[in-house]
């Protein structure tokens, strides 16, 4: 690939540096309202059936908006978790008349606005936004909502009323950032407002929004015109309106035609992320927390920090691409700093995170990139952001994921004449697993047939158009090897469906293909199943069945567009000895055994010279030095099978072990009789224990309850500086517990209290991290009963104790 490559994205974490991006400035105070004196028709003369008429005289539309009006996030974070009670609307004493500033008798003065924004009101329930821990109105585009206007006198048929929504620094009608909706008039573009009831001094409205509307936080105002004059309601932060994508709206290009999918991929606040190896799959629960207080503002702030034009924020293709760039910190001081070095002393070990909320709120609060993340953290945060904004999104794990660095669309491994790896040439790598995201949308920018799931990958691996982002890329184009479809299809295709090609240096210095491993990449692609915590194998949507004609055609079609289009020609095929690797399923701290099984499938005796090299490996495919090796010659009778075993003691691998507890067995061999080359790379991992969580008593909204956490140290050494994390949407805000040291093989018990703030089934998630042991986590489902009398309860969720609290052990025990 021609663009710059990131050592951070591939494996080497750079030390955390003091960020250069300053904290976001507070939202500026509103400028004094001023009336445009330029010529042209009056506001009401130019107010056609709908503001979407693209009138370009945007600076003549009455009082100018102040800077950062209704910005995508603003720096005013919601300051109340609130109850379901409504705030009083703006009263007459707080209004300003347009024009000379006086309120004349007979003028239609707006004395208040009720946006029906509480969680129990019709709007939030119908728009599936009632779980957001916000008091402001949150709606989804393309779907009507209701409001009530309160006037100083009864509304008359001769009165004219218009609603206005504004977003951005310089709202313009033509860009969709200044929306004007005349009440009672039909309009184009999907915006309109209808009177549903006029009663006394109240006017009930049903407002229709465009299915193509910009997403973000809009400021809202009302204008009126009567014979006595014109009036405009001043902007009020309480009347800000959030507009999101709408997968429930058939006219929205993010529409999803399966309610169970919408419940899972938009509304589910937790999920499972898979890791490890194909043969030893691990799973962890992740708290997405997209409805937690402050998270929506953090998601919109990400778009602001990127400087994304407001006019493009209605396009999910553009929004998802920006998010893929901004969730990592490279180029743009985004959310997370990647680190694969193993040294996390200046931040948080990526394995210690249990969810996205702590990360996003830290970024919103400080404006600084958060240390540290690896692929599953980038993907977990991306799922949170895209679900929060209204895109159906899932977290996907690809086992044996290739990282193609030269656009050959193959994984190339180079050996010398004796089949010893040439590390200075081996730039491609195969990750044990890699985690990315699928999000659902139509692709109007592509030919037909490429709608549906799109890959978005926020892990910084390679540049795309000069920045570290990836996607959205149609899964359909990946499946069929159509690598010329945007965005980043060649790189993603290679991750799931390239072949591992072994090259041997010849006597004249040239290289020859000696073996092609066709089923080594993208061997299993999984995500959490809809409606359950089971795995859902989605390999079939990414690739045709391995070995099928369609799959071979896809690979060869893709390779023809790569940098080595003739890689599939002139291959030798004398292969009658089969090789298989087996590794014992062992727990960290135990001894283990690895084995190679050789089978002679021919009719003649075969003599095999076998070499085994064992090293530790990061999950990204970057290996440490070989710490154990074995050489053996095996004679195989026709049809015979022989097993070659290599025991590995804990004391041998303990000094070498790295993150994820992964090891790589390199096997190479040579058959004397026919020259067949044997080559195999097998990765396996050591399992870590789980935390055991037990709920002590019933969980009720607003009432304190307690959880017990039990952990047994599997290692014979002391764990130092042990840190627990606890988090769960609707249960517990992110909490850090410092517990000190835990002795070798010791069992410890902690008790923690929390106050649930939302009813229903919830997930409470915990993790443990120390320099000696990581990737330890646990989860418990908590079924929360409503508070007596019903209703929501938002009061500093999980705020019982601060971050970084030192917690004494409830009990300690031996092995």
UniProtKB/Swiss-Prot annotation:
<keyword id="KW-0106">Calcium</keyword>
<dbReference type="Pfam" id="PF00927">
    <property type="entry name" value="Transglut_C"/>
</dbReference>
<keyword id="KW-0808">Transferase</keyword>
<keyword id="KW-0479">Metal-binding</keyword>
<feature type="modified residue" description="Phosphoserine">
    <location>
        <position position="80"/>
    </location>
</feature>
<keyword id="KW-0417">Keratinization</keyword>
<dbReference type="GO" id="GO:0003810">
    <property type="term" value="F:protein-glutamine gamma-glutamyltransferase activity"/>
</dbReference>
<feature type="active site">
    <location>
        <position position="434"/>
    </location>
</feature>
<dbReference type="GO" id="GO:0030216">
    <property type="term" value="P:keratinocyte differentiation"/>
</dbReference>
<feature type="active site">
    <location>
        <position position="457"/>
    </location>
</feature>
<protein>
    <recommendedName>
        <fullName>Protein-glutamine gamma-glutamyltransferase K</fullName>
        <ecNumber>2.3.2.13</ecNumber>
    </recommendedName>
</protein>
<feature type="binding site">
    <location>
        <position position="546"/>
    </location>
    <ligand>
        <name>Ca(2+)</name>
    </ligand>
</feature>
<feature type="binding site">
    <location>
        <position position="497"/>
    </location>
    <ligand>
        <name>Ca(2+)</name>
    </ligand>
</feature>
<keyword id="KW-0012">Acyltransferase</keyword>
<dbReference type="GO" id="GO:0045787">
    <property type="term" value="P:positive regulation of cell cycle"/>
</dbReference>
<dbReference type="GO" id="GO:0010838">
    <property type="term" value="P:positive regulation of keratinocyte proliferation"/>
</dbReference>
<comment type="function">
    <text>Catalyzes the cross-linking of proteins and the conjugation of polyamines to proteins. Responsible for cross-linking epidermal proteins during formation of the stratum corneum. Involved in cell proliferation.</text>
</comment>
<feature type="modified residue" description="Phosphoserine">
    <location>
        <position position="93"/>
    </location>
</feature>
<dbReference type="InterPro" id="IPR001102">
    <property type="entry name" value="Transglutaminase_N"/>
</dbReference>
<dbReference type="InterPro" id="IPR036238">
    <property type="entry name" value="Transglutaminase_C_sf"/>
</dbReference>
<dbReference type="InterPro" id="IPR050779">
    <property type="entry name" value="Transglutaminase"/>
</dbReference>
<feature type="binding site">
    <location>
        <position position="551"/>
    </location>
    <ligand>
        <name>Ca(2+)</name>
    </ligand>
</feature>
<feature type="modified residue" description="Phosphoserine">
    <location>
        <position position="83"/>
    </location>
</feature>
<dbReference type="Pfam" id="PF01841">
    <property type="entry name" value="Transglut_core"/>
</dbReference>
<dbReference type="InterPro" id="IPR013783">
    <property type="entry name" value="Ig-like_fold"/>
</dbReference>
<dbReference type="InterPro" id="IPR013808">
    <property type="entry name" value="Transglutaminase_AS"/>
</dbReference>
<comment type="similarity">
    <text>Belongs to the transglutaminase superfamily. Transglutaminase family.</text>
</comment>
<dbReference type="InterPro" id="IPR002931">
    <property type="entry name" value="Transglutaminase-like"/>
</dbReference>
<feature type="compositionally biased region" description="Pro residues">
    <location>
        <begin position="16"/>
        <end position="25"/>
    </location>
</feature>
<dbReference type="GO" id="GO:0016020">
    <property type="term" value="C:membrane"/>
</dbReference>
<dbReference type="GO" id="GO:0031424">
    <property type="term" value="P:keratinization"/>
</dbReference>
<dbReference type="InterPro" id="IPR023608">
    <property type="entry name" value="Transglutaminase_animal"/>
</dbReference>
<feature type="region of interest" description="Disordered">
    <location>
        <begin position="1"/>
        <end position="40"/>
    </location>
</feature>
<keyword id="KW-0472">Membrane</keyword>
<dbReference type="InterPro" id="IPR038765">
    <property type="entry name" value="Papain-like_cys_pep_sf"/>
</dbReference>
<feature type="modified residue" description="Phosphoserine">
    <location>
        <position position="23"/>
    </location>
</feature>
<dbReference type="InterPro" id="IPR014756">
    <property type="entry name" value="Ig_E-set"/>
</dbReference>
<feature type="region of interest" description="Disordered">
    <location>
        <begin position="59"/>
        <end position="100"/>
    </location>
</feature>
<feature type="region of interest" description="Disordered">
    <location>
        <begin position="795"/>
        <end position="815"/>
    </location>
</feature>
<dbReference type="InterPro" id="IPR036985">
    <property type="entry name" value="Transglutaminase-like_sf"/>
</dbReference>
<comment type="subunit">
    <text>Interacts with PLAAT4.</text>
</comment>
<feature type="compositionally biased region" description="Basic and acidic residues">
    <location>
        <begin position="59"/>
        <end position="87"/>
    </location>
</feature>
């Amino acid at each position: 690939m021609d663009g710059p490559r990131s050592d951070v994205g591939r494996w080497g974490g750079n030390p955390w540096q003091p960020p250069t991006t300053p904290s976001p400035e507070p939202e500026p105070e509103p400028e004094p309202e001023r009336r445009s004196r330029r010529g042209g028709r009056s506001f009401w003369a130019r107010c056609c059936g709908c503001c979407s008429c693209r009138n370009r005289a945007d600076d003549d539309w009455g009082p100018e908006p102040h800077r950062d009006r209704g910005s995508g996030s603003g720096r005013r974070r919601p300051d109340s978790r609130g109850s379901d009670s409504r705030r009083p609307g703006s009263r007459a004493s707080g209004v300003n008349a347009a024009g000379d500033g006086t309120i004349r008798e007979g003028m239609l003065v707006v004395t208040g606005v009720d946006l029906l924004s509480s969680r129990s009101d019709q709007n939030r329930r119908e728009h599936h936004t009632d779980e957001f821990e916000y008091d402001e109105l949150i709606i989804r585009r393309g779907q009507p909502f209701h409001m009530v206007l309160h006037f100083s006198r009864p509304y008359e048929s001769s009165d004219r009323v218009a609603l206005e929504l504004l977003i951005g620094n310089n709202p313009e009608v033509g860009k969709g950032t200044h929306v004007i909706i005349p009440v009672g008039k039909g309009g184009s573009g999907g915006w309109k407002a209808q009177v549903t009831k006029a009663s006394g001094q109240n006017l009930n409205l049903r407002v229709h929004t465009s299915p193509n509307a910009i997403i973000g936080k809009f400021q809202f105002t009302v204008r009126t015109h009567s014979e006595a004059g014109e009036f405009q309601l001043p902007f009020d932060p309480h009347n800000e309106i959030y507009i999101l994508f709408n997968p429930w709206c058939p006219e929205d290009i993010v529409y999803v035609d399966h309610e169970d999918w919408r419940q899972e991929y938009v509304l589910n606040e937790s999920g499972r992320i898979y890791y490890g190896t194909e043969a030893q799959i691990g799973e962890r629960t992740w708290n997405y927390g997209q409805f937690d207080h402050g998270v929506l503002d953090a998601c919109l702030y990400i778009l602001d920090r990127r400087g994304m034009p407001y006019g493009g924020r209605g396009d999910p293709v553009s929004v998802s691409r920006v998010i893929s760039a901004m969730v990592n910190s490279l180029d743009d001081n985004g959310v997370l700093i990647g680190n694969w070095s193993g040294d996390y002393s200046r931040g948080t070990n990526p394995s210690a995170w249990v969810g996205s909320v702590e990360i996003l709120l830290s970024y919103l609060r400080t404006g600084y990139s958060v240390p540290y993340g690896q692929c599953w953290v980038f993907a977990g945060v991306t799922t949170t952001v895209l679900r929060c904004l209204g895109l159906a999104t899932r977290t996907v794990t690809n086992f044996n994921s290739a990282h193609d660095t030269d656009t050959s669309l193959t994984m190339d491994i180079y050996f010398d004449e004796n089949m010893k790896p040439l590390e200075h040439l081996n730039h491609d790598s195969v990750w044990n697993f890699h985690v990315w995201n699928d999000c659902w949308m139509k692709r109007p920018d592509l030919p037909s047939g490429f709608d549906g799931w799109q890959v978005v990958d926020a892990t910084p691996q390679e540049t795309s158009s000069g920045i570290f982002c990836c996607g959205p890329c149609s899964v359909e184009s990946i499946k069929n090897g159509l690598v010329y479809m945007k965005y980043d299809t060649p790189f993603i295709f290679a991750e799931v469906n390239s072949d591992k090609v072994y090259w041997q240096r010849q006597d004249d210095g040239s290289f020859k293909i000696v073996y092609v491993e066709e089923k080594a990449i993208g061997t299993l692609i999984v995500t959490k199943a809809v409606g359950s915590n089971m795995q859902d194998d989605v390999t079939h949507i990414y690739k045709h069945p391995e070995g099928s004609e369609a799959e071979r055609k896809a690979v060869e079609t893709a390779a023809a567009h790569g940098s080595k289009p003739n890689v599939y020609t002139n291959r030798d095929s004398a292969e009658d000895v089969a090789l298989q690797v087996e590794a014992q399923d062992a727990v960290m701290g135990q001894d283990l055994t690895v084995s190679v099984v050789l089978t002679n499938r021919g009719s003649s005796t075969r003599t095999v010279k076998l070499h085994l090299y064992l090293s530790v490996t990061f999950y990204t495919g970057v290996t440490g030095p070989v710490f154990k090796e074995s050489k053996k010659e095996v004679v195989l009778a026709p049809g015979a099978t022989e097993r070659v075993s290599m025991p590995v003691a804990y004391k041998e691998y303990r000094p070498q072990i790295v993150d994820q507890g992964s090891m790589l067995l390199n096997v190479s061999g040579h058959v004397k009789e026919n020259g067949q080359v044997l080559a195999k790379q097998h990765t396996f991992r050591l399992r870590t224990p789980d935390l055991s969580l037990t709920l002590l008593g019933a969980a009720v909204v607003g009432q304190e309850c307690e959880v017990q956490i039990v952990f047994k140290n599997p290692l014979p050494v002391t764990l130092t500086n042990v840190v627990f994390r606890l988090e769960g949407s609707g249960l517990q805000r992110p909490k850090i517990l410092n517990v000190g040291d835990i002795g070798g093989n010791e069992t410890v018990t902690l008790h923690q209290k929390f106050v649930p703030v939302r009813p229903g089934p919830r997930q409470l998630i915990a993790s443990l991290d120390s320099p000696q042991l990581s990737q330890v986590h646990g989860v418990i489902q908590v079924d929360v009963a409503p508070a007596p009398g019903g209703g929501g309860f938002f009061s500093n969720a999980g705020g019982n104790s601060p971050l970084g609290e030192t917690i004494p052990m409830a009990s300690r025990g031996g092995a």
